[in-house]
Amino acid sequence: MQAQIVNKIFEIFSKNNPNPKTELIYKNDFTLLVAVILSAQATDISVNLATKSLFATYDTPEKILELGEEGLKKYIKSIGLFNSKAKNIIALCKILISNYQASVPNDFKALIKLPGVGRKTANVVLNCLFGMPTMAVDTHVFRVANRIGLAKGDTPEIVENELLQIIDTKWLTHAHHWLILHGRYICKARKPDCDICPIKEYCDYYFNLK
């Protein structure tokens, strides 16, 4: 996709939503990290429902560790893969306390070494908490990028690298939020709402429908 078209797409996103935010609800750096881990193969809505009562009392690594793995499972059992997620979060809490003074590191390599943290989670944390121009590629971003012709790739990492190359630096702080929200509410998986899409005139998928 030509640079001027990419720029136009993000100009439209920016005009329609100047300051996009994650839809995950969190209280501090640690609770965002936990929420993003829980959001893997789950919806933000389901995560927010589960963490509302959890974070009301247990919002630090020390408190989650005190709650314990079985106690944590009781709060997050409505979320997919809750057994493995609980195990990872408890292990993560121990590492944060012992290695990072119970703080969330602001380094990609340090983050992806934490249990339950992959590229997407690390990039979300770096972007949302520390304002870094990262590109977190979830299922929505992967689908939208390929569908509209923004970035073609067979894996999230390939799409991530393509997007980082073609998106102007000035858009990168908000770019992954715009793409996620576009995929969640307009460019849906089964049936995209092309009629209300603000960027359809620049979209490969829409062009091929004609």
From Swiss-Prot:
It is an enzyme of class 4 (lyase). PROSITE patterns: ENDONUCLEASE_III_2. This is Endonuclease III. Its EC number is 4.2.99.18. It comes from the Bacteria. Binds 1 [4Fe-4S] cluster. The gene is nth. The keyword Iron-sulfur applies. One of its GO terms (molecular function) is DNA N-glycosylase activity. SMART domains: ENDO3c (SM00478), FES (SM00525).
